[in-house]
Amino acid sequence: MKHVFIINPNAGKHDSRQRIYDMAEALREKHGQEVQCILTKNQGHATELARKLCQTGDDLRFYACGGDGTVNEVANGVIGYDNAAMTVIPVG
């Protein structure tokens, strides 16, 4: 399973982003998981990213890191895909 952290860089404080990177690194180092961190660039980008990754057919776990908008966008990207699960890391 691939773990994908979709991070809104405008949500929360800068130290919040570092904590997310630390969590991702712990998954990679301690548990040997494949991890990817992606910063969103604009409104709608999280939906686009999640949808494109889901279309690969890989087993994915998404971490929506931001506020309500980020969560909504990631959810819209993964809806309808059986190969994806999503959780929320509130930062907004």
Task: Give, region by region, the residue ranges found by the protein language model.
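ATP/NTP phosphate-donor binding region
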Residues: 1-62
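Short, conserved loop/helix-junction motifs that constitute active-site signature segments
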Residues: 2, 80-81
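Glycine-rich beta-strand-to-loop/alpha-helix junction loops that act as flexible
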Residues: 9, 65-67, 89-91
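Short amphipathic alpha-helical segments
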Residues: 17-19, 75-78
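Short glycine/serine/threonine-rich phosphate/pyrophosphate-binding segments
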Residues: 46, 69-74
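Nuclease catalytic cores that cleave nucleic-acid phosphodiester bonds
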Residues: 62-63, 85
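N-terminal glycine-rich "phosphate-gripper" loop used for MgATP/nucleotide binding
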Residues: 64-69, 78
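Short, acidic/small-residue loops that bind anionic groups at enzyme active sites
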Residues: 81-92
